[in-house]
Amino acid sequence: MVDYIVLGRFQPFHNGHAYLLNRAFEFAGENEVVIAIGSAGKGWESNNPWTLEERKLMIEAWLGSNKKIATIVGIDDINDPPNWVKHASKHHGDGVLVTSDEGTKELYESDNFPVEFVDLANRENLEGWRVRQTLLMLSTVYDDNAVREVLTATVPIPVIDWLIENDAIFRLSTMVAGVNVG
């Protein structure tokens, strides 16, 4: 059996991640999908507003609503790209990486790790920083229906529900004073 691995920070889990995971489940067939959450030790900061546990809960909300099962692991940062694949593999194991990120593809391929590359349509609107900036703009909007209306273009409904039910959007208003790209 071969595991299919999807790696990301999931800050937050958005429609690009959902598309990538759906493709990973297609590739995997009866095999296992492993979701590897990077920057596991980060949380409560502008580029990484949610903790590992919160990101797991977002992903589990999406998985449950789609009747999918996956293993979720966290990976701490080491800030050492040449050694990243070896480090990450200790957490996500061997298998096939499914990615839409060219840099990640090249990093894993340079370490002879099998990769399935997925072209992501509408990538410019589904970058994590854009989704976080939208959430920042909504962080002081208290009309849940308005928040849902705006976010449905980029975030799956179960994740929107989780963010609202857990009051996990407001914190962005306390973290930054302006646009933070990246």
Which residue ranges define each predicted feature?
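Nucleotidyltransferase catalytic core that binds NTPs
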Residues: M1-G182
